[in-house]
């Protein structure tokens, strides 16, 4: 498996933490922009459907081939839009559920080492004698112990075996630690 060096500055790391915290806060807000988006797109879909009914009615009453063809094309476009909106909303709701559930699931538990994720990002940090290791959307980010952020190894984790292989390859023995990576 090929590892890629990724420039990862302290500013970038803190920005990621701030964005993550801001997104979690937004998910807890009942008037979140995502929910507004769902409401607006649903209303828009209803309006489009009403317009379709009007065009179709005019075509039938006037027996106009042009109106019937236009309503057919318009109907196809509405169906495509509805399918895309439905898929998008399902994804949004799933992400919101994952982000706000507060439940954690174990990714790896072996030899006293436990890696856990909450939604798509971890709130747990892992300690090794030289590195902070954080899993962020199934990428391992290695950060220097003294809080001076250096280039990190970024490895997409698609399977559990990839994660085990990464830890074994780099001789990383981790002790499970709760809390933030800063100020330890």
What are these regions (language model features)?
Residues 1-51, 55:
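N-terminal membrane-targeting/pre-transmembrane regions
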Residues 23-26, 113-118, 122, 157-160:
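Mature, Sec-exported extracytoplasmic domains of Gram-positive
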Residues 107-109, 116-118, 136, 156, ...:
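A structural detector for beta-sheet-dominated domains
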Residues 1-6, 124-125, 153-157:
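Generic detection of short hydrophobic beta-strand segments and adjacent strand-loop junctions
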Residues 139-184:
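A membrane-cytosol interface segment of integral membrane proteins
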Residues 34-100:
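Alpha-helical transmembrane spans
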Residues 82-124:
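Conserved beta-hairpin
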